């Protein structure tokens, strides 16, 4: 089954509610129409109720969605008090009131925090920082998780792989890389991928030297100690991780080399370049970044996204909510 059809099937009857803070944006509205018509997910749109309803009614969507106007929200005072409490002395009441009136991402994240919705998708208009910052301040990371990270699902026909971290952590240390690998395994399983995780480097099993190689070797060791049940190997060059014939020469006996499907890059430079090369040269569709490690799911769109991207990331966010 195609990956998004599988996600849709798993969401039937789960009543997931995902807030889309940029509710008046045409790409968001087109995605909301499709979400209502094709899935069991309820989109919750922030914005002017009249504008949103008129648009969707013209498109033939009369029900199956919700609209919240942040400027007339009945629970606004409760939300302000909750934000002040959550920030623990770092935000006064007046500042909290102002930011919730002016910033739809903070408002949307608070809906997630309060359990009114199950997750949030934003970033069609806003920057990554504007989307992720309130999530880190309010939703925060899961217990025993020190950082969030960003993974891309790479799809071409029936092929599916996971690349991480391509979006958030610029130069993670060994502990950070190990954590990214473990969280990427969780994300991979959500997409029906049985994770075989390659810790990538310019070296395979001691063929090269340097601080970056040492970091990847140490990260692999830490990941093994934390999750001995996972199939993780490194350090591996990409050809050794992906090509069986090369793996037999460079990493004989490895349970991962030559058959990896989750690729952990040593830093954001390699990860960002790698996923874009696979997308542009290899013809893969890149879906994400999927944010990993948060207590509740919040995901960031590219400002160059289309309605299909919004639809897919909303399904992923709903799936994360159900999994958690």
Give the ranges of each region predicted by the language model.
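Anion-binding alpha/beta catalytic cores of soluble intermediary-metabolism enzymes, centered on
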Residues: 1-257, 262-324
